[in-house]
Amino acid sequence: MGQGSPLPLLEGNTSARTAVLGNIRGASAKDMFLYTNPTAFLTKEATFQVDASIEIPPKLPEGRELFYTLTGAWSFATSHALFVGARYNAGVKVDMMGSDGNKVDKVIRPYDLTTDLGYAYAVEHWGFFARGSYHRRKVLVEGETYLFGAGISYLNQYTLFGKVVDFGLHATVDRVGAPLRYRASNDTYAIQPILELSADQCLSINEQHQLTLLLGASGTLKEGPANYRAAGVGLEYSYNKLLDLRLGYDYQTLRSHTLGLGIGGQLYGIHLDLGYRLGLASYSVNTLMVTAGYTF
């Protein structure tokens, strides 16, 4: 994850649904709201939602680097919601080498950890959110930083051939904040802010069948070692609000392009989503994602 980025955890996926739908965090988000789109939670008739996810890449000789996410959403008043979450990335074990090239009796276990807070507000067709994160990264020594983001969504409807289409537009500016600073060495590494834009179209064929099309683009706003431009497209078929089938594609200049396949289901407030991302370049890897949650 995170080629060229001083915080690889930022490149991890937090939602199995989002990951396979072109990696687009759009207005139609259904889970992991703090990391996908907090304003989308206010469109649901829910007071609380708790979600957890895990991203599983292939195992390497040094171990398997797993990415965990846990988040909760609370609508404490009409059109207002608070969010809390945490992300954790670890699993690799690296042997230390001495100056003579031989192993020494010390092992490095790198990890990344964040704690995150967010707030969202909705009025008529508009939604607004802000969030902040504390990031800690440890390799040989520990580094930390604080990052912030904000976004806006617009939701409305139109009619196409007598069918209702729900559409949404979403924009986010994220990763704005201080450089990553390592305490012991006082070395600093700039974090590049990003801009994300997306559009969602959900066609209700009838009461049982819906199709959702997502289009998105993103990129860094400042020059740096992790410069990238990305675009994605996703298609989701929903049956009777119980079963979802998903297909998506995303391309990023810094990483390989990927094909996403996914399935999800929900019943009695419980949802479970599986996603598989197939890397389409010789140097890329395939990853499995699982997201589960409960709404009440």
Protein language model regions, located:
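Subset of outer-membrane beta-barrel
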Residues: 3-296
